[in-house]
């Protein structure tokens, strides 16, 4: 039995990543720069400001065995401290949705490890370009810089001088020391992890989160408890679109968001339309519309 399980797991690890990449090759490894809105140039006059404020929209959604289980999105403001690089967040018009049927089917155990993989992006510390320029070899190739690990391509850095945009794409899986993690009888095996960041080009060829335009992570993993008969294939996509940036002297606090789910949905729709945020694929949008609002503090559903 153990031999068959190991054989099955090995087959999944070998076969599924290839399937996922083949089915979504254009989306996951596009080979071209993502269509993002170029922001207006921001000039600094007078004293050096303390913060840069980035405003934008994020969405993060998860499928379990190809059925949507969680969807979270909202409008965000990041205040990046220009001295130490630390980031503070204001979030409003937040929307938290889940598939009540799938959530109700989660088995309650003495030690629960949630399968929830959605998250709110947090641009802080080092960008992908900063990390990978220091850690790995870069090689020029036909106007593109290839990112190499042990002479194998794991990503690329592309520049569009016409639009003044630079983009880095990385397949992070080859950089992992361990693909399998275990806790309280649960096992998670990573099988795909692809990230993208796009920046406005800076004159000094240095990219920090103050130049960020777009960020995306796309990852898949197998998840199960030791008592489960089979593993679930979990797929999580998280995107962040920056729509405004400005230098400011201090952070602005906002009142706690008391919007109802309907009010948040309306505000998010208006914001996305006004800022030309790319729409979800039609099938994904339809699945999202079937989900139920919930309170992330206690996971209870919100009745309107």
PLM regions with names:
Residues 1-28:
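Bacterial Sec-dependent N-terminal signal peptides
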Residues 24-304:
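Surface-exposed, low-complexity/disordered segments
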